[in-house]
């Protein structure tokens, strides 16, 4: 009989890949953007605008908020189409940073001066999840805000527009 211990299998450390981490952050950003707009009154639509980010990333593609062409009766407004490189969809705000319910009937509703024009795109959050009674379930994701880049952080419940 040998006194040598049996060889054991090496345990490999399983760390999330870069793609996995990126994918997770995209989902978090999308949820936060859509949730903020739903709270502001655009139940199944997301109030968004195009924006160039310092990183040069195209968040319109990254966060799956791609605009869709819709007929005038199918939704609040027409989509301007696909965004170019370094452009992003971002929650757009009125003077207080909230989506403007009055703009629901307008395509490219004007926002605050210098902010640009907003469009309305279909949200992927179910209507039930956007209702006031379910807001508490989304508030639990608040710690994710610290992980997001500056422009995506919320100030007093609304998106910063700077």
Curated annotation (Swiss-Prot):
Keyword Cell cycle tagged: no
Gene Ontology biological process terms in this record: viral translational frameshifting
GO MF: structural molecule activity
Main location: host cell
Compartments in which it is found: Host cytoplasm; Host cytoplasm, Host perinuclear region
InterPro entries: HCV_core_N
Record region (Disordered): 1-23
One GO CC term on file: host cell perinuclear region of cytoplasm
Pfam families on file: HCV_capsid (PF01543)
Entry superkingdom: Viruses
Membrane-traversing stretches: none
Biased composition (Polar residues): 13-23
Keyword Repressor: no
Keywords: Host cytoplasm
Note: This protein is very unstable.
Protein name according to UniProt: F protein
Species, as recorded: Hepatitis C virus genotype 1a (isolate 1)
């Amino acid at each position: 009989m040998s006194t040598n211990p049996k060889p054991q299998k090496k345990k490999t450390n399983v760390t999330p890949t870069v793609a996995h981490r990126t994918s997770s952050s995209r989902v978090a950003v999308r949820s936060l953007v859509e949730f903020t707009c739903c709270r502001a009154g655009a139940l199944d639509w997301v109030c968004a605008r195009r924006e160039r980010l310092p990183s040069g990333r195209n968040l319109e593609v990254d966060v799956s908020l791609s605009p869709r062409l819709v007929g005038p009766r199918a939704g609040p407004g027409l989509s301007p189409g696909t965004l170019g490189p370094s452009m992003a969809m971002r929650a757009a705000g009125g003077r207080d940073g909230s989506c403007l319910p009055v703009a629901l009937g307008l395509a490219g509703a004007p926002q605050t001066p210098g902010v640009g024009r907003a469009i309305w795109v279909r949200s992927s959050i179910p209507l039930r999840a956007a209702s006031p009674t379910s807001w508490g379930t989304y508030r639990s994701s608040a710690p994710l805000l610290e992980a997001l880049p500056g422009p995506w952080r919320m100030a007093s419940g609304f998106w910063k527009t700077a």
